[in-house]
Amino acid sequence: TSRGSCSFTLSMNPRLRSCLYRGCYGTIMTMETSAATCDITGVIAGSICGFEMFAEMDLKVFKSYILIKEVRLRHCMDPALTAAIISRESHGGTIRQDGWDHKGLKFGLTQLDKKKYRPVGTWDSKEHLLQAVGILTDRIKANQKKFPTWSVAQYLKGGLSGFKSGTEATATPADIDDVISDIIARAKFYKRHGF
């Protein structure tokens, strides 16, 4: 469907519960990333191992964010992906001053750019997360309309690219960069840790 790979109804049948847990926009654990993997020497900048190291540092903070799992119900988005975006952008809100970046241009757990979006709510509020995940799902749907032959993984990655850049749809699959691989690698880590 245009909403993703699952139909969304309010009944809580087993298929829907499974769909809500993983989200309607692809299965994170099967998605490939373009970053280098770890080798015996350990963490490499820009590697899956490096991305997961940062995700692990933020894991304690996410245990208290019940909102991440609540937002999935509204937008049918995998909570592991939401946690990964928050980890990538704000380390769970631990490194931001009153929710703003050091230049005062990006706001909240997901660091929405005020030039591209009009952030709502407080920096760590349900309203902020609903807005950010809503923007992401809109970007995914824009790619579904523009590129009907893309795979589910390309829709999700293209949506993430559009979310980060502030554009409605990605131009080509090649526009999907290392930042997206970082987010997917972190999402896989969070999926393995209960999200």
List the model feature ranges, each with a label.
Residues 96-118:
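Short, surface-exposed glycine/acidic/tryptophan-bearing loops
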Residues 94-97, 171-172:
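Extracytoplasmic/secreted cell-surface and envelope-processing proteins
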Residues 2-46, 54-61, 73-75, 113-195:
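Non-catalytic cell-wall polysaccharide-engagement segments
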Residues 88-92, 166:
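A short structural micro-motif
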Residues 77-82, 105-108, 155, 159:
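Residue-level detector of well-ordered alpha-helical segments, enriched
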Residues 65, 69, 90:
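Mobile, glycine-rich extracellular loop/lid and propeptide segments
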